[in-house]
Swiss-Prot record:
Residue ranges annotated as motif Nuclear localization signal: 70-106
Protein name: Structural polyprotein
Sequence segments annotated as region (Interaction with the capsid protein): 722-726
Organism: Sagiyama virus
Region (Transient transmembrane before p62-6K protein processing): 727-747
Amino acid sequence: MNYIPTQTFYGRRWRPRPAFRPWRVPMQPAPPMVIPELQTPIVQAQQMQQLISAVSALTTKQNGKAPKKPKKKPQKAKAKKNEQQKKNENKKPPPKQKNLAKKKKPGKRERMCMKIENDCIFEVKLDGKVTGYACLVGDKVMKPAHVKGVIDNPDLAKLTYKKSSKYDLECAQIPVHMKSDASKYTHEKPEGHYNWHHGAVQYSGGRFTIPTGAGKPGDSGRPIFDNKGRVVAIVLGGANEGARTALSVVTWTKDMVTRYTPEGTEEWSAALMMCVLANVTFPCSEPACAPCCYEKQPEQTLRMLEDNVDRPGYYDLLEATMTCNNSARHRRSVTEHFNVYKATKPYLAYCADCGDGQFCYSPVAIEKIRDEASDGMIKIQVAAQIGINKRGTHEHNKIRYIVGHYMKEANRDSLQVHTSGVCAIRGTMGHFIVAYCPPGDELKVQFQDAESHTQACKVQYKHDPAPVGREKFTVRPHFGIEVPCTTYQLTTAPTEEEIDMHTPPDIPDITLLSQQSGDVKITAGGKTIRYNCTCGSGNVGTTSSDKTINSCKIAQCHAAVTNHDKWQYTSSFVPRADQLPRKGKVHVPFPLTNSTCRVPLARAPGVTYGKRELTVKLHPDHPTLLTYRSLGADPRPYEEWIDRYVERTIPVTEDGIEYRWGNNPPVRLWAQLTTEGKPHGWPHEIILYYYGLYPAATIAAVSAAGLAVVLSLLASCYMFATARRKCLTPYALTPGAVVPVTLGVLCCAPRAHAASFAESMAYLWDENQTLFWLELATPLAAIIILVCCLKNLLCCCQPLSFLVLVSLGTPVVKSYEHTATIPNVVGFPYKAHIERNGFSPMTLQLEVLGTSLEPTLNLEYITCEYKTVVPPPYIKCCGASECRSMERPDYQCQVYTGVYPFMWGGAYCFCDTENTQLSEAYVDRSDVCKHDHAAAYKAHTAAMKATIRISYGNLNQTTTAFVNGEHTVTVGGSRFTFGPISTAWTPFDNKIVVYKNDVYNQDFPPYGSGQPGRFGDVQSRTVESKDLYANTALKLSRPSSGTVHVPYTQTPSGFKYWIKERGTSLNDKAPFGCVIKTNPVRAENCAVGNIPVSMDIPDSAFTRVIDAPAVTNLECQVAVCTHSSDFGGIATLTFKTDKPGKCAVHSHSNVATIQEAAVDIKTDGKITLHFSTASASPAFMVSVCSAKTTCMAACEPPKDHIVPYGASHNNQVFPDMSGTAMTWVQRVAGGLGGLTLAAVAALILVTCVTMRR
């Protein structure tokens, strides 16, 4: 069975049925076996009569002069009405209609959906109860599979349905005669609001959500419509997420059915809940009348509730017994949430400090203080009940409390809560108070009782709320931003949280006994008294009237008031009545919910940009967090809380930095290669230029060059001196010898002893012609050698442009080579020039727009704050008790003998030393765990997904692909395969912890091995699973003498300790600029590695040569060039062309990156290109269509030290040499080389001459 409906012509939506014509038979109930055509004259007569009556009434109304009087509204004539309906018009409507008239008028969206639903949905009933709905969509009828029952339509009920457990649907073909009632459907779901039976449905991020309370069990199967009346989804259930509920739905995409099930989803089938009474089952919402009402039979009703406390329908039974299941009496209002409190009562409990440093039994004893809300609100539980008067009914400005055995009330206005100052009370209900309090080390609750006495209780409690966001503010700002937080929702409606109530114990009261002439009189005073006297026999029992015990003393009697027709909270300061406790449950108001909190925005810092550094001037109004990190391989994270004016200098590199001040968004900046001097000036300017860029390398290079010059000069001078000495030594040793003219000139010999040049040459011609020719050729040889050396030096230095030799870029894609390697850097454009025979060259541009590295996670457990559950102690008077086994986490049980507890009315037991107390305690998840918990995962192989923009020809399209070397995407007819990435790197360790939106690399303990006070002391698979493990070092202690309580010691929560000491999250210290996100856990835009690409581009993507412009005489002239800046170069290309058109433009060198991929060729023969380079003297080849030319430029350094964008070119890994610098180097090297060569030649020549002698 295909679960995608077929769109057909019969999809008429939210239009009323067409009016019946007189010549057609109305669809009305008719006796069987009646031919419709025979009724046509009767129907025509009826409708004609209706028309005449309506016209007459309208005419009378228009012509009447008398004032208007109240009249019954004329009902619209409908073809469906028959004679039987007309007879019943004047009858008195039944009471049910009267009640329905009081219902709230549905809103516009509800009315719209009711019109649509009128035809296309049908109730599903089980035993006469509606459990859900079936919907007609397209050509199919669909019903949720979990909804039990039969469709309330005979034609649909007999169909054969095919069930799908994957989609939780049952589906069948619609009968032909019902196709006109079906609804259209659509797979188009733009984000916004949609409609359903209970109002608006918000669709955002692929999730349908509604306000909590708008949907309930029984709504399963209801459709969600768009504004055109088309079905976009079918509701299956919902997951309570606090203020909103996420819907579980079945919906459609373009070609398939999908099911979305949020975590914690509950199916919304209205299953019939059954309860039990004396082994007889009955519907929980309809209890048997023995008992069925608390007001009639309170004690029996409480016992029945206690028997069913663990059944799913307990709260239905509780509501039915509190309202007595009488719809005439039960009115829905805000006071209905207080109905359950008439079955409960406040109590007196032990308080160690009643405000004056002394203990007492306080009516406002503090039971618990909860501070899970991140906005600083606390919830306090006390013994008194607020918002209820002494009669047990709701009264907002009253406080109900206990004095002795009697109920009293006081004004709520006198209620106060203190820490270091007065707290602001935000809400009260029952035993609970929610308030905002200033930080402090203690908490006190007090009120003025009916006698104007102060009733108070004070406990030690350290209140120091953690800041919301990154600023520690004390006053909520008028302006700021909204950040996620948790708070106690100010609602008294029933919630998922609950507290246990139990039957109170017998309260001892020595004032009930009085001594009268050797007898003891028990004064009942309208109460039931349980007494026990040891004087005589048979003086044990209960009485509701005054009773006298003869021949007895007060010391020999014990009396206690017994009352089991009300519950009270299961306080650990009040003993329980039975060893096996009988309990009930009531909802807790003010649930913890996810919300948003307005936090301030710190003043924008004053920013001063320097050379590779950033100075920020910070003016905090309150302690504010400053953090920054590098975006390179070494993040070097830094954080500091700042509470006064300071200046901080942040180093900025070419890799970039990210800093964040307070709650302001993070700022990313990159350094540019700015410097002083000029790369194309005089030597001192060039040296200053390079010293600003590479100070160490410049110092080393200049020092080496200077040393080379000095050594070259010294060597040349030494060689010249040696040659002169060798030249003149023979003549100096020979008496009367004359130095030849040539040697005299070369060796600077005195002329007085030398012959003339002609004489010397004549002498050599006569005596040694070989030496004559050597003497003549020596200067010429020296000149030739020098010229050759200079020529070779120039030829060697000419190609030593370091920018061409070194680059981080990737090789250019050649013709027919459909592979490339693109850098995994977001926003960095990669271009390839592709040539193909018979086609004009094409430029392919690939740009990574975003990457996502998502690891495979295995949830080990979740951990959160725990709560210690301490049941009321069981005190066995004059006897012994034993511990029982209980499957509870960290369960502890101890029996203490020889206790003698007291309550406010006297000793709880009659015996002195034979009494025992059974104390119990165990650990459970705190109620805040649903909102505040950490998840421990094991991370495995990460899968990388990239979003890449592909541009070639006229195509510019974005695609998303897995970078694994296997996933292939098709873009414009071309096939691309990306990956695998060159570097198998991930920022996640093998073990990670996810807390809210932060991720931490942490080696957590395995499941079942948690240690007290450490991360993982409480572990469970989910926030609701039953496999809770706890190790909190819980130990019970012996109770103090005379006091009813359960003392214990325990290690503080390891989760709360971890929250304070968890350190910097991976979000703030991930290398390579990774952005860490959750849901799911992933690292986005990590700039590491390269992505190989395989391409298969068809010929249709190219332009044929005959269709492309023919470009000739291409020349390049660079007008402006700023290196190391984002497209800071402008080049003008001139050319000749035969026709206008479009040509691909590409740089064949990695020295420069051209911004344009294609240009429009015009007949004027001139185009302008923008390029980016890191070279001071770039020389790169540019091609336009099939023509090529070389662009050469002299670039200046950028003026801005720091910019908010990264470079769009390949950076240099070796100091670059400008053309001017190379010219100066060549000149210096040529001069020194020539001098050195001359010295070498002279030395060689003189040596040769002297050796021949």
